[in-house]
Amino acid sequence: MGSDETKSTLDTERSTVPRTGTTTKSCSITQVVLRFVLFAATLTSIVVMVTSKQTKNIFIPGTPIRIPAAKFTNSPALIYFVVALSVACFYSIVSTFVTVSAFKKHSCSAILLLNLAIMDAVMVGIVASATGAGGGVAYLGLKGNKEVRWGKICNIYDKFCRHVGGAIAVSLFASVILLLLSIISVLSLYKKIR
């Protein structure tokens, strides 16, 4: 009779304890998918920015004048943008493999989750600052600055400005993905140590 009570007590405890395996698995699938989307977004933004070169000829009566080409290497802020997104792209590859291998082993340590949470937060800062720097240059190119007599260039280099704007928009999307990853990493760490 004592064994029947023990069985019913164990069955009751099993039914009241939440299953953490399903939440961990869904969390890992979400992380892997978001890290892959992050890779695609950062790579797309890099490619769009690097291919943003445009040259123009201005025709003055009598002779055409070739003005300098507009390319991302003309601005230190856009160079920083490309480098920062390259770092984030590389990080997304490494973190995807680490996440997949950790969850395949079914042993995701608290140290690994802490490292992912810290690195995700660092990457949010890097990508957000690069997006802001690139956005500032793009805004100056679009509107100019009358106070210091910087003319707008997007009326001349329209294709270049569209590329820069597209790269910055995709980078902003990557920043949001990184923010979501950072939140998920912290929640996973919280569930692990709780």
Swiss-Prot record:
Keywords from UniProt, A to Z, are: Cell membrane, Membrane, Transmembrane, Transmembrane helix
Q: Does the keyword Transmembrane helix apply?
A: yes
Which loops or segments lie on the Cytoplasmic side of the membrane, by the record?
1-31, 99-109, 185-194
Q: Gene Ontology cellular component?
A: plasma membrane
What segment(s) does the record annotate as region Disordered? 1-23
Source domain of life = Eukaryota
Q: Sorted alphabetically, which PANTHER family does this protein's record hold? A: CASP-LIKE PROTEIN 1U1 (PTHR36488:SF8)
- This chain belongs to the protein called CASP-like protein 1D1
Organism (species): Arabidopsis lyrata subsp. lyrata
